[in-house]
Amino acid sequence: VLACCWLAAAAADGNDERTTSDLSESLRRRGETRTYHAYVAKQQSKLALYPEKIRAIDVARQHQVRREFAAAVARGTAGVAGFGGRTVLCLGARLGGEVRAFKSLGAVAVGIDLEPGRGNMDVVFGDFHDVPFAADSFDYAYSNVLDHIYDLRRFGREVARVVKPGGLFFASLYPGASVGGADAWTAKQAASLDDRPAFVAAMRACGFEEVDETRITEDMDLSSVMPPGARNAIWHQKILTIYLRRRS
């Protein structure tokens, strides 16, 4: 059973605008300047606006994540020999596709999301800037929605807090604004492939060290839930997953 201590879901209004002066310019340039509460409301609106698209992405991610990490186990990437009995936290898990992927590999997995939908048995409500679990709860953490980060330093500290010493954070980065990867939900301190050095430096400052990485190229077909002729019906994905170990 995963230990849980529910934390405050939102900061006080006076703390909404958080400092970014110590971050790379590349991690300060994207997303609208908005308050934290406005950011949360924006992120929560996506499922209601695009339910079929979100479901399709969730199913596709489930299969992609399972393939990716089954291959990582086979290679022994970062010393990962298997997920049997290991605890995994999926950050920004949408409807739980990646949670189910890790469960299928033997993990004890759970996800958090600002809008997990109703009756979700795999994902609970939670903000990855204020993770609702106790310190040192998880062997591994995973996220593929780093383009939705509002405050990278706060995010990194929270991941470091809940991952056990010596545990791993699997951080998947995708192409960013320079190649059309940004969208209306790209957040204030979004991290993409463009930002790899700055992202790794920020996570290092939060207590992680980079130990390995994998790169895959894979298409995601969303034509069934997109308007006919839509230019982005096929997502040509270049995915860099950085393996970051929490220092003891």
PLM regions with names:
Residues 139-152:
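A short SAM/SAH-binding and catalytic strip from SAM-dependent methyltransferases
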Residues 129-141:
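A short acidic, Gly/Pro-enriched loop at the edge of an enzyme's catalytic core
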Residues 87-130:
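Class I SAM-dependent methyltransferase SAM/SAH-binding core
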Residues 153-168:
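A short glycine-rich, Lys/Arg-flanked "PGG" loop and its adjoining helix->strand segment in the class I
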Residues 170-202:
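Conserved class I S-adenosyl-L-methionine
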Residues 19-80:
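Class I SAM-dependent methyltransferase Rossmann-like catalytic core
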Residues 81-86:
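Short helix-loop-beta connector
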